[in-house]
């Protein structure tokens, strides 16, 4: 039988305002990247070790307020409480979502492909860092019709993976870019723009040109990982997925290795599907689409290094919470019930 990751509650937060849901999450380590010295940055070393010291670690949630105009907010959760950082209405772009990323003890939002709004210190006065090659006529990297998506990505270095959609817009992602960000020089530029190679997947659809959809991306130890939830253009909530897979890919989207690949899900006659989200740890969070599938609607973890699944045991009274991120021993959970009702910061008690 499968091993189980057991969680215990450190702290529960009940937001005082009405928020929609968790768009994406991150973690801040207690360490400033500047303290690590510029040398390590030149070498592209990890600014944020996956060990995530418990000392001063904070969790981040990108969400939106229920009240009109539905402004974005970043919630910063620590053992002392919850801080809300409201993002201005200039973030409400009809085409582009903001992308949250974290860097040591700082975090940023990539805004409309063109700039980074970078929060350091007490987060009261963010810096605006323009992305050098985002504006025509210099933009050779991102196509004009690429739209930025908020989907959770993780990076342990300078290259930040970002999900995009182009040509047709369903609020999905079938393309990705890598943003090279130097937090010391305060410079950023787009490095590449690609789709995932569809023919590498056993159950790809030859009848269409649709690239695999991307749920989440991760850069770790100079390797790029992508989780795809198949190619279907129809509603997966209604019809289920065609396939899902976890792959190590090149910046050009070439599939180097498949770590996980489902069967053809449409063949079984029963709707199914699993979404994947990378974390600040070795684990990928797998969330089933339907409650009546083999997993009974329960999330699982997949270890990238050991290539094995784990079950998750939530703390008592929190079985309706979903897991959103992991960093070292810390886990970030949330309860969604027609809005973001509770947030949990939990600790990994052990694996049984």
Indicate residue ranges for each PLM-predicted region.
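Structural motif
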Residues: 67-74, 114-120, 168-179, 233-247, ...
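Beta-propeller fold detector
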Residues: 8-13, 83-89, 127-136, 189-197, ...
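Loop/turn-rich, solvent-exposed surfaces of beta-rich toroidal or solenoidal domains
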Residues: 229-230, 264-299
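Short loop/turn segments that connect beta-strands within beta-propeller blades
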Residues: 77-80, 121-124, 181-185, 250-253, ...
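An edge-strand/N-cap motif at the start of beta-rich repeat modules
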Residues: 1-40
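Blade-level signature of beta-propeller repeat domains, shared across WD40, Kelch, NHL, RCC1
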Residues: 321-352
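Repeated scaffold domains used in trafficking and secretory/extracellular systems
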Residues: 18-24, 43-51, 91-104, 135-154, ...
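Short beta-strand elements that form the blades of beta-propeller/WD-repeat-like
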Residues: 8, 26-27, 56-65, 99-111, ...
